Structure formats: structure tokens, C-alpha cells
UniProtKB/Swiss-Prot annotation:
<comment type="similarity">
    <text>Belongs to the CTP synthase family.</text>
</comment>
<dbReference type="GO" id="GO:0046872">
    <property type="term" value="F:metal ion binding"/>
</dbReference>
<feature type="region of interest" description="Amidoligase domain">
    <location>
        <begin position="1"/>
        <end position="266"/>
    </location>
</feature>
<keyword id="KW-0479">Metal-binding</keyword>
<dbReference type="InterPro" id="IPR017456">
    <property type="entry name" value="CTP_synthase_N"/>
</dbReference>
<comment type="subunit">
    <text>Homotetramer.</text>
</comment>
<feature type="binding site">
    <location>
        <position position="403"/>
    </location>
    <ligand>
        <name>L-glutamine</name>
    </ligand>
</feature>
<feature type="active site">
    <location>
        <position position="517"/>
    </location>
</feature>
<dbReference type="GO" id="GO:0005829">
    <property type="term" value="C:cytosol"/>
</dbReference>
<keyword id="KW-0067">ATP-binding</keyword>
<dbReference type="InterPro" id="IPR017926">
    <property type="entry name" value="GATASE"/>
</dbReference>
<comment type="pathway">
    <text>Pyrimidine metabolism; CTP biosynthesis via de novo pathway; CTP from UDP: step 2/2.</text>
</comment>
<keyword id="KW-0315">Glutamine amidotransferase</keyword>
<feature type="binding site">
    <location>
        <position position="72"/>
    </location>
    <ligand>
        <name>ATP</name>
    </ligand>
</feature>
<dbReference type="InterPro" id="IPR033828">
    <property type="entry name" value="GATase1_CTP_Synthase"/>
</dbReference>
<comment type="function">
    <text>Catalyzes the ATP-dependent amination of UTP to CTP with either L-glutamine or ammonia as the source of nitrogen. Regulates intracellular CTP levels through interactions with the four ribonucleotide triphosphates.</text>
</comment>
<keyword id="KW-0436">Ligase</keyword>
């Protein structure tokens, strides 16, 4: 079967939800038995989002093979079974870097390097490479049509549609159809102008996804179809919903998957959305609720912790609970004290970088440990828990991380200078290494200690989880901390790096160096998050007695 391409663009304004729409369509097509993958093309000049501020760009999603990617890839993995790789996300910066590298190497035989054909050819080559082995590949272009940054991507996709044949390509355009209260009606003009912008660069959309706060009336859909030269059945109304997991059913109810399959002449069974119906049922019928306090430094933008937020919701589905997330700035713990932590049923300290707010996180870990509140530490959250235990239990009063104090006397957390990647290759890092692309990244094996809470939760001895860090537990000082009672319950494949720690004589205190949120899905959840939310609910029931 030839590979079929769906190109997804956005118009009028940004943040319409192209990624969610693309992932939802992929979920329906997958439910019809098709092998689907999704790619994200980002117009910014950064090589990847690895060094971008989380408060500007949101979280960095890490793939199995260690690529630092856009948060939309997290949505893709939560909606479909296909795992993303470094082939599923690339930026303008990465494209230009590769073209310039080839030019220096002499690959272009002295040609004058230009956007067309060299940049566009590189884009096309990467899209085709990422599509190998799949029935359908959905390609999302970041940004908004009309932005100068996205023009090379749009031109490349226009050319690709000609090369592979229009019978194997479909352009899907998301637009805003705003409702004007004073007029009492939705307005289609922004959509018409957005399509006109696409037409000016040679792209005629085949499907229009119309975003609004309500369903688009049939007469307005007919109007959009007429003036935008699109089949009326291909004008899809995508209203605001309470849960993003309602969107696959909403798109299917309007026949989008049927239209796509007919366009590509694919013969496949009807989509079975039973799993998604179960997700929605659990979401709509919780038997209780819990409040989780998330203590971090990027709390002004919840998207900075997107996968953690979703993983907590998934754990709620697993336990039939509604999970409320209370975002707490770790600096508030420093300035206002632990009073800001009162009233939460469980405490989660996610990953992060830099010294700002660290002492507040350490006080948070101490509060959770001493008051028997369920605690889940992730990446930095584990290092924080270790520092707190070293200072207040093990007698290492000057314990710290060399990330925060290079000259600290008791660096219980220090820079990893050498480690093995998932393929067994040795990676080396020094203080002079670049910040970008030099961390321990991607899926790594972890061995769980028999009898530990982690082993009980996972139900197996060896697991594989994704990492993104450059600091680790210092094994030189670890024996003194273990002697004071801290349990190391997870170790790397070579048994050299600490992956999981647990505090004994506590209802639930588990911290991990890896990022379990990256592998949590609404259909399957994740054992660590499920166990944490369950423990938080037990704590909640005690507090309301």
C-alpha cells in the first residue's frame, strides 16, 4: 500500500488545537486498523526545544530514542499506539543546520544554496523518511498560515503533494469561526480569508476544521463550503468540549474518517472507539476526588508540565477519581512557609533546572516526609528528596547539588560525566559541554529491587523509562544516606546510577530520576502515578473523617 499524507495547517489565530485535532483523527484511523504516525514541523530557528524556556514554549517531550521535541508529540502518543521518534519532529533550525553541514562537506557540488530547492528538498526528504512503513502519516505544520517563518514548509508540502500525487495527499486546514454575541451569529469571513491566504501559495484545502465555542449551523457550513471551494461534508464543526478525549468521537460523528478513507480509496472496517468510550465513562463518573499540590518553578504556565498534568488525570481514570491540581510556586514556600501546602492530599515535585525555588522544594519534601503526605518526586523532585533526607536525617547538613553550588562540601547530587545510552554507547560530558543535546536522554533500563513499593507497582523486575537530566546521585556519599534509612529501589542497567528512592515508614514516598509522565496514556495510565493518586485518596479519606 502506498503511503498517504494528511497535511494539517492552521489559520486566523494560533493555539486552535491543530495537534489535538491531528491526534484525534489519527486515533480514529488507527481504530479502523490503519498504521498511522504523526509528524510536527516547527518553524522556529532553534535546533530543538531543549534549551527553550518552559514558560515560553511549554514542556519538552522526550521520545523513546532520546529526541527533545515539541509537547504536541506527547499528545500524539497519548492518542495513538505508535511511538514517536526523532523523525517525528524537526525545526527550521534543524533543517538549516543539516543543509549547511552538507554544503560545508561539498554535497551540493558548488551550487548556490537557496531556500528553493535545497531547504524545501531537505524538508521533503525528512517527511518521506518519517513516513516509511506507515499507511497514513499526518503532518502538522506549526504556526499560522501567513507567518513568514512557515513558508518554506508550506512550499515543501505543496511540492510533495505534486510528487506523490494528489490521490495520496489531503490538506486539512483548521480555522476559527468566532461567535459574535452582539450579532447573535458565527462569522465565516476569517475562514474565507485564511483559505485565500493558503490559495495564494498554491494550496487548496480539502477539509476545513472549524473551531468555535459551538456547533456551526448547517447554513453556515454550506456557506463556508461554497466560498472556500470545499465539499460541504468536508466542513467539520469542532466545538469546545470539556475533555480533549471527546474529540475523536466528535470528528467521527461528522464522518471525517469516512471522507479520508474514501479520498485515499482505503477499504477498512468501521472505527471501534470502545476504549475511548470507556475513558469518557470513567471521566464522567468518578467515585471521589483528590487534590494534588504540584510544587514547581514554572507554575504560571501549566503547559510547562503538560505530560505531568495529563498523567495525573490518567491516574484519576485508573482509580475512578477526579484529580484537582493545585499549582504552587516553590518560591512561595520559601517566602510564605509550608502553610501554602496545607489542604492537599498528595504532593508532586516535577522536573526542573536551576537554583531558583530549590530551597522551597526542599522544604516541601521535608513537609511531605514529616507529615506522612504521599509524595512523588520526578527527576529534580528525586534529587530534592535526596538532599532533604541527607540534610535532615543522615546528618549531612551541608548536602546540596553541584548544579546549585559548584563548591558545596557535600555534593550528594553531581554532574554525570559518563553514562551509557539506550544502544550501549558511552556518552561523556564535562562542565564545558554545550547545554543543548548533552543530557542523558531517552529510554533506559531500570532494575527494581525485590520487595520495594516500585517493584510491587510495576509488577516486574526490569522496566524501561525515559530520562532527561545531566545530574545524578553521587554514589560516594550514598552509603551514609542509606545507613540513615533511605532505600534505593531502582538502579540503571549497569547498577551505577540511582533511578528510584523510597522513604521507609511512610504511607507513600517514592521519587524517580526518570520521567514516567512521558509514557502515561488515558487508556493505560502509569503504575507510579496510579499508585500515587491512590495513596493521595487514602490520605484524603483520613482527613475528612
Amino acid at each position: 500500500m502506498a503511503t498517504n499524507y494528511i497535511f494539517v495547517t492552521g489559520g486566523v489565530v494560533s493555539s486552535l488545537g491543530k495537534g489535538i485535532a491531528a491526534a484525534s483523527l489519527a486515533a480514529i484511523l488507527e481504530a479502523r486498523g490503519l498504521n498511522v504516525t504523526i509528524m510536527k514541523l516547527d518553524p522556529y530557528i532553534n535546533v530543538d526545544p531543549g534549551t527553550m524556556s518552559p514558560t515560553q514554549h511549554g514542556e519538552v517531550f522526550v521520545t523513546q530514542d532520546g529526541a527533545e521535541t515539541d509537547l504536541d508529540l506527547g499528545h500524539y502518543e497519548r492518542f495513538i499506539r505508535t511511538k514517536m521518534t526523532k523523525r517525528n519532529n524537526f525545526t527550521t533550525g534543524k533543517i538549516y543546520s543539516e543543509v549547511l553541514r552538507k554544503e560545508r562537506r561539498g554535497d551540493y557540488l558548488g551550487a548556490t544554496i537557496q531556500v528553493i530547492p535545497h531547504i524545501t528538498n531537505e524538508i521533503k526528504d525528512r517527511v518521506i523518511a518519517g513516513a516509511q512503513g506507515h499507511d497514513v502519516v499526518i503532518v502538522e505544520v506549526g504556526g499560522t498560515v501567513g507567518d513568514i517563518e512557515s513558508l518554506p514548509f508550506l512550499e515543501a508540502l505543496r511540492q510533495l503533494a505534486v510528487q506523490v500525487g494528489r490521490e495520496h495527499t489531503l490538506f486539512m486546514h483548521l480555522t476559527l469561526v468566532p461567535y459574535i454575541p452582539t450579532a447573535g451569529e458565527v462569522k465565516t469571513k476569517p475562514t474565507q480569508h485564511s483559505v485565500k491566504e493558503l490559495l495564494s501559495i498554491g494550496i487548496q484545502p480539502d477539509v476545513l476544521i472549524c473551531r468555535s465555542d459551538r456547533m456551526i449551523p448547517p447554513n453556515e457550513r454550506a456557506k463556508i463550503a461554497l466560498f472556500c471551494n470545499v465539499a460541504e461534508r468536508a466542513v467539520i464543526s469542532l466545538k469546545d468540549v470539556n475533555s480533549i478525549y471527546q474529540i475523536p468521537a466528535l470528528l467521527k460523528s461528522q464522518g471525517l474518517d469516512d471522507f479520508v478513507c474514501e479520498r485515499f480509496r482505503l477499504t477498512c472496517p468501521e472505527a471501534d472507539l470502545t476504549e475511548w468510550e470507556q475513558v469518557l465513562y470513567k471521566q464522567a463518573n468518578p467515585v471521589g476526588e483528590v487534590t494534588i499540590g504540584m510544587v514547581g518553578k514554572y507554575t504560571e504556565l501549566p503547559d510547562a508540565y503538560k505530560s505531568v498534568n495529563e498523567a495525573l488525570k490518567h491516574a484519576g481514570l485508573t482509580n475512578r477519581l477526579s484529580v484537582n491540581i493545585k499549582y504552587i510556586d516553590s518560591q512561595d514556600v520559601e517566602t510564605k512557609g509550608v502553610e501554602v501546602l496545607k489542604g492537599v492530599d498528595g504532593i508532586l515535585v516535577p522536573g526542573g533546572f536551576g537554583y531558583r525555588g530549590v530551597e522551597g522544594k526542599i522544604r516541601t519534601a521535608q513537609y511531605a516526609r514529616e507529615n506522612k503526605i504521599p509524595y512523588l518526586g520526578i527527576c529534580l523532585g528525586m534529587q530534592i528528596a535526596l538532599i532533604e533526607y541527607a540534610r535532615n536525617v543522615a546528618g549531612l547538613t551541608k548536602a546540596n547539588s553541584s548544579e546549585f553550588d559548584k563548591d558545596c562540601e557535600q555534593p550528594v547530587v553531581a554532574l554525570i560525566t559518563e553514562w551509557q545510552d539506550a544502544e550501549g554507547n558511552t556518552e561523556v560530558r564535562t562542565d564545558e559541554s554545550d547545554l543543548g543535546g548533552t543530557m542523558r536522554l531517552g529510554a533506559q533500563q531500570c532494575h527494581l529491587v525485590s520487595g520495594s513499593r516500585a517493584r510491587e507497582l510495576y509488577g516486574k523486575e526490569t522496566i524501561e523509562e525515559r530520562h532527561r537530566h545531566r545530574y545524578e546521585v553521587n554514589n560516594t556519599l550514598l552509603p551514609q544516606i542509606e545507613k540513615a534509612g533511605l532505600k534505593v529501589t531502582g538502579l540503571s542497567a549497569d547498577k551505577k546510577l540511582v533511578e528510584i528512592i523510597e522513604v521507609p515508614n511512610h504511607p507513600w514516598f517514592v521519587a524517580c530520576q526518570f520521567h514516567p509522565e512521558f509514557t502515561s496514556t488515558p487508556r493505560d495510565g502509569h503504575p507510579l502515578f496510579a499508585g500515587f493518586v491512590k495513596a493521595a485518596y487514602e490520605n484524603h479519606k483520613k482527613s475528612v473523617k
